[in-house]
Design a protein with these regions (language model features):
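Bacterial N-terminal signal peptides that target proteins for export
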Residues: 1-11
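A structural signal for conserved, well-ordered secondary-structure elements
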Residues: 31-183
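C-terminal motif of bacterial Sec signal peptides marking the signal peptidase cleavage site
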Residues: 19-22
Length: 183
């Protein structure tokens, strides 16, 4: 019985910690207004948020890619094609549970996670999906509204799609202004 008390305390602390972390996520983040000034003067980049970090802990050394690393973005399929990098992007993305897309230090949107075809979790908000099944020789990256796609018609996903409308408009308008939009 003596040995079970410390274990029970540790379990209670762990559960409370996970609950507080889950409750502190920014599901009600405010929409970013569309601003042509951001498009003209801003720089697009993405940073990773580690498992033990919060969004405010993200530092400059956590930059995963910038607009210079994006070759093009297909509006129809939402495929995002990256240029060749020294370290494969999927390896750089693996330690992070969130990816924040910035335009000139303003958050455009937060991608819930980097997921691969092997992932068996369900995500009801934006994800960066790494597809290696359709082309094993070269993986493809997609920005999806959820993962797996069979959850696209749920109320939660539909609400998130509406919530992200202005951000998508800004993101695509910016990429179009840089000649990186593909239809």
């Amino acid at each position: 019985m003596k040995h079970q008390r410390p274990l029970a305390r540790m379990m209670a602390i762990a559960i409370a910690g996970m609950t507080m972390t889950a409750c502190s996520s920014d599901d009600n983040e405010t929409e970013m207004p569309f601003s042509p000034d951001l498009v003209e003067n801003g720089i697009l980049y993405a940073c990773g948020v580690g498992l033990s970090e919060t969004r405010t802990d993200v530092e400059a050394n956590d930059v995963l890619f910038t607009e210079n690393d994006i070759e093009w973005f297909n509006v129809t399929t939402r495929e995002i094609k990256f240029r060749e990098m020294q370290e494969p992007l999927y390896q750089r993305l693996q330690p992070f549970h969130e990816i924040i897309f910035y335009l000139d230090n303003n958050i455009i949107f937060v991608v819930s996670s980097f997921v691969g075809d092997w992932d068996n979790r369900v995500f009801t908000d934006l994800v960066l999906h790494y597809d290696v099944i359709s082309d094993p020789n070269q993986g493809h990256y997609y920005l999806h509204d959820c993962y797996p796609s069979q959850f696209i018609d749920t109320d939660e996903v539909k609400a998130n799609i509406i919530k992200n409308t202005n951000q998508w408009k800004l993101f695509t308008y910016y990429l179009k202004s840089k000649g990186k939009l593909k239809k």
